[in-house]
Amino acid sequence: MSRVEGLTSWYSDWQGLSAAILGIGVSGFAAADSLRELGVDVTVYAPEKHTRYNKLLDAIGARYVCAYLDELCEVDVDFIVVSPGISPDNPVIKRLRDRQIPILSEIELAWRVRDKVNTCPWILITGTNGKTTTALLTGSMLAKDGARVAVCGNIGTPVLDAVRNPKGFDYFVVELSSFQLSLLPMHGNGAVKGFSSACVNLDEDHLEWHGAKELYYRAKSRVYHGTTGFCVYNLDDEETKKMVEQACVARNVRAIGFGLCVPDVGQVGIVDGILCDRAFLSARKDSALEITSVEKLEKNKLSMRHIISDVLCAVALARSVETNPLSISRALDEFCLSPHRTEVVAKEMGVMWVNDSKATNPHAVIASLSNFSRVILIFGGLMKGVDVSGIFDRFYETIKAVVVIGKNQSFVGNIKCKKIVCIPDSNDPMSEAVAAADLLATPGDTVLLSPGGSSFDQFESYEHRGNCFINAVKDLVKRK
């Protein structure tokens, strides 16, 4: 066993070790900063110069080397911390493993040193869509109940920053991407063990990175591995149930289902418009505990089907750590959705304009389309190797027309739609798309930006894409 494998605490002897961090960003810097604090000699390797990080790394005593990944096969260090953007199947990573160099992710490193201030339960959340909303919902429910909560991970705040917070926390709510999960070990001291774990839903995504649907699903399934308390799964998504059934977990772990249906014993669901818990109350065999109503959720813009599903998942996770139902209800009353997620931008002359720019895969588009009856769909971007034709087959009657954006529109030949308008690449493709959608829309229609792909071919981010849509719609409304 290497010396690194035996390091299971902030207070273990890290002094004098050397580490290479591959990639820089918020998580890479958090790893560098943490390791320097632990007395580790740190060198960060990244293919581009980052002026801001250069100065920060210099300030903490870490070196920065501009280098591409394929130049690092012979790097000589005690262990490596890799960015979640680097595949574990990358030939360079395989070569480094062959040299018996331990390879950690920021998440594994955080798990090993989680006791710096205090050790608290980790609530793990993943899913193709809705994981950020579910993490924020769960965090707000626990906080409303008086707990100190760190919502961290893929959501933006590195887990290592939460670990090092001097005040400590009662719970970590950790959002995990498939990239982060694929880097986690299944065994040994670095294997992360959540108290409660959930996969919100599952569908094809990031196939250009994972290589196959099965490998993407396998990465997602790791969220349940080693769970010590509760595995929360989606009753409306058979794949998540299979994951729980096949997971290697601690003894006496309970499986809790959630779904848009009347709940059975051990489930969270809906009865006559009331969200109910039949999983965590002692009299669950013959009664249910009321949490809130769909009517109340509607007042707070949380009543779309896919959002209610996220709410139910968060309810199950919050109840798994004995959160008071009244606290959950109050948190839901105050919760605001993140921007760019089925966000109503305008209602003008009988037409509703909805910004769902965060829908970066087909599953998210399907979830969004399920809420509307007649849609002009603005669609397109980087498709990440996923077949999108199923969307248009399934919603042929719902989609009145599709306005296609994005540089690569080759998928158009494979989709079936009543009307297709392709927007050529330009300096302002969104304004052109909004103008085209306006010509097609009639009273009763919803113009829905739900692109189904990443934004980077024409925009800086999904936020930038969504803001371009919002601005274009506002300009259109002003002119009318």
From Swiss-Prot:
UniProt xrefs under Pfam families: Mur_ligase_C, Mur_ligase_M, MurD-like_N
Key words, A-Z: ATP-binding, Cell cycle, Cell division, Cell shape, Cell wall biogenesis/degradation, Cytoplasm, Ligase, Nucleotide-binding, Peptidoglycan synthesis
Cellular location(s): Cytoplasm
Class of enzymatic activity (EC top level): ligase
Functional pathway: Cell wall biogenesis; peptidoglycan biosynthesis
One GO CC term, this protein: cytoplasm
Reactions that this protein is recorded to catalyse: UDP-N-acetyl-alpha-D-muramoyl-L-alanine + D-glutamate + ATP = UDP-N-acetyl-alpha-D-muramoyl-L-alanyl-D-glutamate + ADP + phosphate + H(+)
Keyword check for Acetylation: no
EC number: 6.3.2.9
Gene3D superfamilies: Mur ligase, C-terminal domain, Mur-like, catalytic domain, NAD(P)-binding Rossmann-like Domain
Chief site of localization: cytoplasm
Gene Ontology BP terms: cell division; cell wall organization; peptidoglycan biosynthetic process; regulation of cell shape
Binding site residues for ATP: 127-133
GO molecular function: ATP binding; tetrahydrofolylpolyglutamate synthase activity; UDP-N-acetylmuramoylalanine-D-glutamate ligase activity
InterPro entries: Folylpolyglutamate_synth_CS, Mur-like_cat_sf, Mur_ligase_C, Mur_ligase_C_dom_sf, Mur_ligase_cen, MurD
Family: Belongs to the MurCDEF family.
Protein purpose: Cell wall formation. Catalyzes the addition of glutamate to the nucleotide precursor UDP-N-acetylmuramoyl-L-alanine (UMA).
PANTHER family per record: UDP-N-ACETYLMURAMOYLALANINE--D-GLUTAMATE LIGASE (PTHR43692:SF1)
Name of the protein: UDP-N-acetylmuramoylalanine--D-glutamate ligase
The organism of origin for this protein: Tropheryma whipplei (strain TW08/27) (Whipple's bacillus)
High-level lineage: Bacteria, Bacillati, Actinomycetota, Actinomycetes, Micrococcales
Protein encoded by which gene: murD
